[in-house]
Amino acid sequence: AKAGKYNNSLFSKVTKDFMINGGYCGTSSYGEAFEDEFCDRLFNIRGAVAMSNTGADTNESAFFINQKTAETYKNEGGWEHLASQWDSIKTQLANYKDSNLLTAFIEKNGTNCYDTDSVPDSVKKLYEENGGNAYLDGAYNAVDRGYTVFAQVIDGMDVVDKIASAKVDKDDIPVKNIVIKSIKITQYKEKSTTQADSTSAKSVTQPTTVG
């Protein structure tokens, strides 16, 4: 961001009631893909910003913003749906254990191996109240798959929702370019006396223009 690599990049894939993807501008600042980093205090709730990837440890420059609302999350079945999915997946994992098919199964279904049995009630409540995409969290994934969360939209979700509502083609690619003019790193000051370096929502969303 400081080098201006994100300037005039695009939100290249938009899926309403799910997420908006952007920031595809080549390799990472390390010059190569870097490893996933999961934390049981950072979650893919609505407004969370996370690294896009194409598999384990393939993070580069692209990111996404979770856009799913609490209402959509509830309508999709919420925790009951995720728990049912996990019951099915963990049975398959047990069947594939110590099998050459396990690696292939994880590659295909890794993100869905979300161990709802290990998720604290406080985290479940967080998703119920805010929405988001819980199964993308790596901290509670049984096979170490997921997406690295590194920021949170604190202001401007109306802009995220507007981007998510843009007209797209059959592959969820916006018909008109949605341009990220720039991203700036600012110091976010909470109402308390503590401070933390973060990418604020203004840095991510407000400079973005639709059209």
Protein language model features and the residues they cover:
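Cyclophilin-like peptidyl-prolyl cis-trans isomerases
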Residues: A1-G211
